[in-house]
Amino acid sequence: MTDPVRFDPLSLDLPFMDEAHEQFMQLLAIVDEADDLHLAAAWRDLVEYTAQGFACEDRWMNDTGYAARRDHQIQHRVVLEVMRDGITQAAEGRLLHVRQMAWQLRDWYHKHVQTMDAALALHLRGKRFDPANGGSGPRRSSVAAARA
């Protein structure tokens, strides 16, 4: 008997992007599970990780000449600005607002990955882009990476 095929709506079959998406969802789950005392710190961790992840994607788009980068980067900026506002909301004790933001963020993120990031992943695969190599070019195999 064969194992059933599993569908992961956040998988783009590009390991470095898939790992980033998985980490984002893990941090978002921590926000969801955080009690009121720890919510602000969990949200701050999510915002910091997201800022770094968006910066990486923005750099990849610029470095590879991705045609749709402007719209993609605008989405990153707008969402990150709203997320940063959540830090202020948490500091002011509006924790329910932060929890609602987390709930809405999950929905947006799934759509963003399935549309914007899926198109970017297709572009990066076409360019044979690998951030471990510092950009475009042949991907380093795990054997070659281990020897380096």
PLM feature spans:
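Small-residue-biased structural context
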Residues: 1-148
